[in-house]
Every structure is written in C-alpha cells, then in structure tokens.
C-alpha cells in the first residue's frame, strides 16, 4: 500500500511521527539509555521521519539522548522540540519572555547537537507574557537560522491567530483522540484556514484506546494519569462500553485498537500528523503501520458517534492542569 506523505511547513513527513516523551517521563521510570537509543534508531530504520521532544522531558535528558543516539542521522528526520516549559534547580517553570525563549533554544541546540531545530514550539501559553512578544523572539530565531519553523502547543484558536499575525505558525500540537476531541471546537478549523499542520499528541488516548489498556490500580507511581480524572476511577470503568465498541470494529478490520485510534486521527483531517509515543518496539511497529489502516467515511462517523464528546465520562485534566493550557472546552465541561 502506497503511503502519501503529509505536509509539515515546507517539509513532507510520514503520516505518523514519534513522540519521545515516554522515554524519560510521563508513564513510568526512564527507559534504559541503551534501549532507548536502540528504539530511536529502529524508528528511523522503519521509516519514521518526524521526532518530537521538549526541553522539559526528562529535564533536558530526552534532548540529550536524541542528540547522542542520532547524531550521525540528523539528515534523515525532522526534529521538533519545545520551549517555555523549562526547568530550574530540578523544578518546572513557565517562562515565555523573549530572552528566556532564546536562551532555551541555545540550550536545546547544544543538547540535541544541532545547528538548527527544524520545528520549535512554544510548549504552553504564558499568561504573563503577550504572545506577540514571544513570537517576536521565535521569529528572530528563524532569522538567525537557529530554528526553521515555529509551532504552538496547547493553545486555542484565538492565540493561534494572534501568533500567526506576527510570524507564520507551521504546526499546532494538542491532545486529540477519540477520548479528547476539544480541537474540533475551533482549533482544527483555524489550522485549516491558516494552513497550519495539526499535530495530535496522545492519539491513543494515553494508552486507554488499546486492546488491553492498563487499569488505574496498575499505574506506576510516577504515572501522570494518576492525577487526570478521565484515566482514574470511576471514569476509567464508565468509558469501557465505548472502548468495547471500538475494539469490536478493530477486530472486524483486522487491526489493533491503537491502530484504529491513530487511523481515526489521520482520517479526520489530511493535515493531521499524530505523534504517538512508546517505549515498546512492538508498539513502535504497530503505530507505524497505522498509516496503512484506511477508514471509510461511515466508519469515521460511527466512531464519532460512539465517542461523542458528551458521552465520554470525566474531565481531561484536573483544575490546575486545565489552568495551564488555553485549549477550548465544551459548554458541558464548563458547567460540570
């Protein structure tokens, strides 16, 4: 089956990218460095050519790993990283001041062992800094050749339009899956209007949209799903009837549930490039092959109906996490 590459700014990439956060944090302890390096190289061997990291992942260790493991293969893939969510003395901080963005970029370039970062995102909105000021710094980095493309993450359509007015935005990254469809409120339309590639993270619903999703009681102590209501009880169990319907469809189609979930994001918009993450070589192969799963319009419509936003139980984020993003919410979420 011939796979059509997808547009990412002036580049074209394989329809499924690789999110690298899992190798250092999010769902458990960091991976063994040698095993993580082997996984990254296997990804490139397989044909992945869009890798996503961030300053905050592993407090810089994720970028360092990629820089070391793929130093001699930089021409084979598009490298994305992120600023604004930073670390200092082992603690997270948010800083989108122009001078902070430029300093963070220099540090990322050093860790990644690169002269230029292909795609550089603002990881979160900073309520203390106008987006126009931050974008001015990002535009400067493009002019200086430090970055090639500018991206935004976890921001709404309003901030996207303001940012794009300062400098073209190549990509918008936000959580998007059958479980979390908030980008459909406004961001996907704004991306389409402005010619911005949409990059869904967690397209497998943080592991829930799988053949055998881990139960909350089995989460590792460091698993961030422990504090996200939708992935804890009672909501984990309450959403199982939706999952079972999708699992039946996947079984009928001869694909895994995770492949169906990724294929759904690909079918929703030709400008979507999902970036599922994994520490497993098997899941790496499965996710890559999801680009070969073709959904008919009626299958997409069926999944849309099963996972209607109002049918999915539990908030995506707790109040603190929700306050850190600028993504739109459905009216029923605001009154819950």
Task: Please give the residue ranges for each predicted region.
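N-terminal binding-site loop/beta-alpha segment at the start of enzyme catalytic domains
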Residues: 1-77, 330, 334-336
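N-terminal small/glycine-rich loop or linker at the start of catalytic domains
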Residues: 9-27, 80-93, 116, 121
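Short, well-ordered coil/turn segments that N-cap beta-strands
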Residues: 11-16, 47-49, 73-77, 114-118, ...
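Conserved, mostly hydrophobic/aromatic
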Residues: 18, 36, 51, 66, ...
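Active-site beta-loop-alpha junctions enriched in small/polar residues
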Residues: 21-23, 54-56, 82-86, 122-125, ...
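Glycine/proline-rich, positively charged
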Residues: 88-182, 186, 196-197
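Aromatic-lined glycan-binding groove of carbohydrate-active enzymes
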Residues: 183-221, 256
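Terminal-tail/helix-coil boundary detector
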Residues: 193, 221-248, 252, 267, ...
């Amino acid at each position: 089956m011939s796979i059509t590459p997808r547009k990412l700014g002036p580049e074209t990439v394989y329809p499924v990218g690789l999110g690298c956060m899992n190798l250092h944090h999010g769902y458990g302890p960091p991976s063994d460095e040698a095993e993580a390096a082997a996984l990254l190289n296997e990804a490139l061997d397989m044909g992945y050519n869009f890798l996503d990291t961030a300053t905050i992942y592993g407090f810089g260790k994720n970028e360092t790993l990629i820089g070391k493991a793929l130093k001699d293969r930089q021409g084979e893939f598009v490298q994305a990283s992120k600023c604004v969510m930073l670390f200092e003395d082992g603690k997270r901080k948010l800083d989108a001041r122009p001078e902070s963005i430029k300093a963070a970029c220099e540090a990322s370039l050093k860790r990644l062992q690169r002269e230029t970062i292909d795609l550089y995102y603002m990881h979160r909105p900073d309520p203390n800094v106008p987006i126009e000021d931050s974008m001015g710094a990002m535009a400067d980095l493009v002019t200086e050749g430090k970055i090639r493309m500018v991206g935004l993450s976890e921001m709404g359509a309003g901030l996207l339009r303001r940012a794009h007015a300062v400098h073209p935005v190549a990509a918008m990254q936000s959580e998007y899956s059958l479980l979390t469809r908030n980008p459909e409120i406004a961001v996907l339309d704004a991306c389409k209007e402005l010619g911005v590639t949409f990059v869904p993270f967690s397209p497998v619903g943080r592991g829930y949209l799988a053949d055998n999703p881990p139960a909350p009681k089995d989460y590792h102590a460091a698993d961030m799903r422990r504090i996200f209501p939708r992935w804890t009880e009672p909501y984990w169990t309450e959403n199982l009837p939706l999952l079972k319907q999708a699992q039946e469809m996947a079984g009928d189609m001869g694909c895994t549930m995770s492949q169906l979930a990724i294929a759904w994001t690909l079918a929703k918009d030709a400008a979507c490039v999902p970036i599922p993450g994994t520490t497993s070589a098997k899941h790496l192969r499965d996710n890559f092959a999801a680009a070969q799963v073709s959904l008919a319009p009626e299958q997409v419509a069926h999944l849309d109906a099963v996972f209607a936003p109002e049918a999915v139980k539990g908030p995506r984020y707790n109040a603190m996490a929700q306050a850190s993003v600028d993504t739109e919410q459905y009216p029923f979420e605001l009154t819950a």
